Design a protein with these regions (language model features):
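Flavin-dependent oxidoreductase catalytic cores
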Residues: 1-115
Length: 115
C-alpha cells in the first residue's frame, strides 16, 4: 500500500515538517508500505525553492523517521538530479511527472544519461 502525502502546503498555518513526519510514522504503523512525499493543497511548487526535488528536506526528515521506502516528487526534470538525490540519501525512489508529459522519451534518455 502506497500513500502520497502533500507534506508541504505552503499555506499560513498549513502542515509543518513535524506534522508530516508524525503523520508518516503513524501511516507506517498502520501498514503503509511506501510514502510518496510531494507538495500540498497550496500548489505544486514551493515558494523560495527552485532546486529539483524541492521537497527534499521533507523527504529526508520522513526517511529518518520511518523504515519503509520514501519516494520524492517535486520539480525533478533531469536524470542527473534524480540520481544525485538518490545517492545523497534524500529518498529511496524518485517520482517524475511533468517531465514525462513533456517528453515521452524521458525515461529512455534518463537511463542513457546516468549509465
Amino acid at each position: 500500500l502506497a500513500l502520497r502525502l502533500g507534506a508541504c502546503e505552503s499555506l499560513t498555518n498549513g502542515n509543518t515538517m513535524e506534522d508530516a513526519v508524525s503523520a508518516c510514522v503513524q501511516f507506517e504503523k498502520a501498514g503503509v508500505d511506501l510514502i510518496d512525499i510531494t507538495g500540498g493543497l497550496g500548489g505544486y511548487v514551493r515558494p523560495g525553492h527552485s532546486e529539483q526535488g524541492y521537497f527534499q528536506d521533507f523527504s529526508t526528515a520522513v526517511k529518518q523517521a520511518v523504515s519503509i521506502p520514501v519516494l520524492l516528487t517535486g520539480g525533478i526534470t533531469e536524470a542527473a538530479a534524480a540520481d544525485a538525490l538518490l545517492q545523497s540519501g534524500k529518498a529511496d525512489l524518485i517520482g517524475v511527472g511533468r517531465a514525462l508529459l513533456k517528453d515521452s522519451d524521458w525515461a529512455k534518455n534518463a537511463l542513457c544519461a546516468v549509465q
